[in-house]
Amino acid sequence: MRNVFFLIILLFSTECLAEEIREIAITIDDLPLVGARMDTPGNRQRATERFAKIIQALTENKVPATGFIIAGSIAKGEMDFLEQFKQAGFMLGNHTYSHYNLNQTSAEKYIADVDRADKKLSLLLTEPKYFRYPYLAEGNKQKKQKVRDYLAEHQYIIAPVTVDSLDFRFNERIYRVPYRERENYIQKIKPEYLAFIWKQTLRAEKRAKGKPVKQILLIHANILNSYLLNDILKMYKEHGYTFISLTDALTNPAPAITFPAITEEKQEHTNDPLEEDLFSIWGD
């Protein structure tokens, strides 16, 4: 009887511990840097400082992040950013050459674009090789299979997303503000942005239905996150999250955001303008 009692206690304790464990991988799309200009010394300096802020936030918080590169967006001088990212110990994956939406592009054109990026990034990509679909768009059944066959043939692992920050809509708002006012504006929208990311995280946890799965956050390399990434990471730590690598997250990932799932969620969240913006760019 005593052994049975201790077994029950052990099982109960293990279950509670599993429920308390919160783990998340941080993934950053659209490297080198969204909206960066390298055409003047001043612009180069600003881009360099913003990218350095991203690396600093990840390093100081000991985050084993993974970045995804748009190969066709690498301007002169930005290859150094990617080298710095890699040398800091972070992983780099393929995000296509031209950032095509597979729902609006043929499989053949899309595969050629991915392959073009694969060749250009061959010396930068880390192992294992990861691929992230732009817009998380995987196309219809036929296109999806063709692209997946290519990715498998070239040893790519698809990097899913379980928490989408939709940060691009917040980032767009920054560019409507005069340059000298942008830093203050970013601080002004910080509470709204952080609250939205946490709201998205809670939704992801709800989809997991109590299972001790691992989350994967999607953000972008942009001006918004160059200033607020440290705050995002602090928020997750305050809520008990531990940062893990994408490789670790894929051992037991939370339910990924997919087209069917997002289409269904639209029925529940049609009052959210940020979500409506996202749905509007995803059509088949």
Report the location of each language-model feature.
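Active-site beta->alpha N-cap acidic-glycine motif
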Residues: 19-135, 235, 251
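Hydrophobic helical h-region of N-terminal Sec-dependent signal peptides
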Residues: 6-10
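Acidic carboxylate-rich catalytic motifs and surrounding loops in phosphoryl-/glycosyl-chemistry enzymes
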Residues: 69-71, 162-163, 247-248
